[in-house]
Design a protein with these regions (language model features):
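Conserved alpha/beta enzyme-core scaffold
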Residues: 14-290
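Tryptophan (W) side chains
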Residues: 2-3
Length: 290
């Protein structure tokens, strides 16, 4: 599948549809597995998450899937949208713990599936390969399998060695944020990719918000292209990753992160979130590009 999609660098305009944030947010059903792209405090789909939280009613009983989860994910946890979490890290990097996730984890308000970088990588690889599991020596000799009874062991038929069989990870909806999208449906990301490319090829539905609309994506050494038809829907969302960074357009808004942490630690999450949601998203000119 990877090689097939990679070969289609400039596709058919009919393959991908440009929509607005409100329409995109309506595509996330209750109870689904929602993956959010980016890494820690870099290029997270914050504008999409805020629009999701403007929905009435808000989505519920979601399983959050992130290689690393951060600010945008903490908003969803604090708003009561998340039932289960699958990630190997949930925090705000140098700005500390993710306060709403930490509180929910401490009170038992979330189902947390124990994950490591290896377990997520193997589960994603299995899904991309179309197989039920991916064998690995990761977790051998640790107590981690005791925390995940769904993770089984297999015997290597060639060596007789016992291996961990990490099950394939399913994903209903993946949302990424990129630099540019064109009318053909191609998307340009910067090179701090995380597992964004893998999310494109393992998820049932892919939505990408972008900083800019261009006539035709141009290749460059400091960026990567998600070729059409990797994303089913594109959304024009300028500054859509703020307050996380979107290199080279803007840096991490450190003061906003500190304001968020202070608000949550002082019991002010609802007031903080309410202030964010009252701000209208930027004009979505991309909705007219379909």
């Amino acid at each position: 599948m990877w090689w097939l999609c990679a070969a289609v660098v400039f596709g058919n305009p009919a393959m991908t549809e440009w929509i607005d944030l409100t329409t995109a947010a309506a595509l996330v059903p209750d109870g689904c597995t929602l993956a959010l792209g980016g890494m820690t405090v870099y290029r997270r789909p914050v504008a999409f998450v805020l629009e999701l939280l403007r929905r009435a009613p808000r989505p519920k009983e979601l399983t959050l899937l992130c290689f690393t989860a951060g600010y945008e994910s903490d908003l969803l946890v604090g708003a009561g949208c998340i039932a289960a979490v699958r990630t190997c890290y949930f925090g705000l990097e140098s700005f500390g713990l993710a306060p709403m996730f930490t509180a929910a984890a401490q009170t038992g308000g979330l189902r947390i599936l124990e994950e490591t970088e290896a377990s997520l990588a193997m589960g994603i690889r299995a899904k991309m390969a179309g197989v039920g599991f991916m064998p690995s020596t990761a977790w051998i000799g640790t107590d981690l399998p005791r925390l995940r009874p769904d993770v089984k062991t297999v015997i290597d038929p060639y060596s007789g060695e016992e291996l961990i069989a990490f099950p394939a990870i399913d994903c209903d909806v993946a949302v990424l944020h990129g630099l540019e999208g064109d009318r053909y449906g191609n998307v340009r990301l910067n090179n701090n990719l995380g597992v964004d490319m893998e999310l494109v090829y393992m998820s049932d539905l892919v939505i990408v918000t972008v900083e800019r609309i261009v006539e035709k994506i141009q290749k460059s050494a400091d960026s990567s292209i998600v070729p059409a038809p990797g994303a089913a829907y594109l959304v024009h969302a300028p500054r859509g990753a703020w307050p996380t960074s979107c290199y080279p357009d803007y840096a991490v808004a450190g003061e906003e992160f500190m304001r968020y942490v202070d608000a949550c630690n002082g019991g002010g999450f609802e007031a903080y979130l309410g202030g964010l949601l009252q701000k209208q998203p930027p004009a979505e000119a991309g909705a007219a590009q379909g």
